[in-house]
């Protein structure tokens, strides 16, 4: 399911702190990690001593294969380079932190770049918010509880196969949150039949699920924190009625979840 993982870094401690997550997943799936740095050319923060400081493998992960590469930015913005490089290397997953050096935040791993990748990438992407008052607070190299969030529309099922595969490999509990905005018509069975079909198509079995109503973005973030979720899985179309563009609900979850967020833009 996951054979190749792209890990972008600007060599900062914050960016590199997402590396254990990429390695942990690679170890579970026997996947290759492509650790890449996008060379800006004139970045004054990349000195001769720090230029090639890719993160080292965590203890106990020596069997994971890591391929390191420095690639030129060219005329593209960093998010486009990340997505193109992931496609060229046939990566199944992108793992990145949402912030690098504060004074060059808009250059590489700033919020705008991470959110652009999350918004536009059709390759599943895990974003770990590593700074600020709403930063990731749970350990990011282990999984005990994964939340799959769906509005029961077809677009929301596209991330389930990846979430279910991660849950299966890591032995994590996979819980489903069905969200209903004000005015949404709730199925008589609460969505059980639709969920059973989604899970069957993903080769998994639907277990525990809960329904949330109203301000669903806030409700999802609060639920994830209260129940100590290790990963939240969504698509950019969450709560949109089918439009694949990043919705306010998906954006709020990306910016405020207390754990990494697995997301993708549906086809």
Language model: regions and residue ranges:
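Amphipathic coiled-coil/heptad-repeat helices and related helical stalk/stem segments
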Residues: 18, 78-79, 110, 159, ...
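Gly/Ser-rich helix-loop-strand patches that form or flank binding pockets
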Residues: 83-135, 222-267
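Small/aliphatic-rich secondary-structure junction motif
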Residues: 1-52, 60-63, 141-190, 196-208, ...
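Short, well-ordered secondary-structure micro-motifs
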Residues: 45-46, 106-107, 137-138, 159, ...
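A conditional alpha-helix N-cap/helix-loop micro-motif detector
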Residues: 15, 75, 107, 156, ...
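Glycine/small-residue-rich hydrophobic helix-like segments
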Residues: 186-238
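Charged docking surfaces used in two-component/phosphorelay signaling
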Residues: 69-81, 211-219
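Intrinsically disordered, low-complexity Ser/Thr-rich linker and spacer segments
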Residues: 132-144
């Amino acid at each position: 399911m996951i054979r190749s993982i792209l890990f972008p870094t600007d060599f900062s401690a914050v960016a590199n702190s997402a590396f254990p997550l990429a390695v942990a997943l690679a170890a579970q799936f026997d996947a290759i990690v492509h650790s890449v740095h996008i060379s800006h050319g004139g970045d004054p923060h990349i000195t001769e001593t720090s230029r090639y400081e890719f993160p080292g493998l965590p203890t106990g992960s020596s069997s994971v294969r890591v391929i390191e590469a420095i690639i030129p930015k060219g005329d593209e913005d960093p998010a486009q380079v990340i997505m193109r490089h992931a496609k060229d290397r046939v990566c199944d997953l992108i793992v990145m932190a949402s912030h690098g050096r504060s004074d060059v935040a808009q250059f590489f791993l700033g919020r705008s770049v991470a959110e652009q990748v999350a918004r536009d990438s059709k390759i599943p992407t895990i974003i770990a918010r590593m700074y600020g008052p709403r930063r990731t607070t749970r350990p990011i190299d282990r999984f005990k509880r994964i939340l799959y969030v769906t509005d029961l529309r077809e677009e929301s099922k596209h991330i389930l196969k990846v979430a279910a595969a991660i849950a299966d490999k890591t032995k994590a509990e996979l819980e489903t949150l069905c969200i209903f905005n004000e005015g949404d018509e709730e199925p008589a069975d609460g969505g059980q039949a639709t969920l059973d079909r989604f899970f069957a198509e993903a080769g998994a079995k639907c277990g525990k699920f809960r329904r949330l109503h109203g301000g669903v973005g806030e409700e999802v973030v609060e639920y994830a924190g209260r129940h100590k979720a290790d990963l939240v899985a969504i698509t950019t179309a969450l709560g949109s009625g089918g439009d694949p563009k990043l919705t306010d609900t998906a954006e709020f979850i990306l910016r405020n979840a207390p754990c990494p967020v697995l997301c993708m833009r549906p086809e």
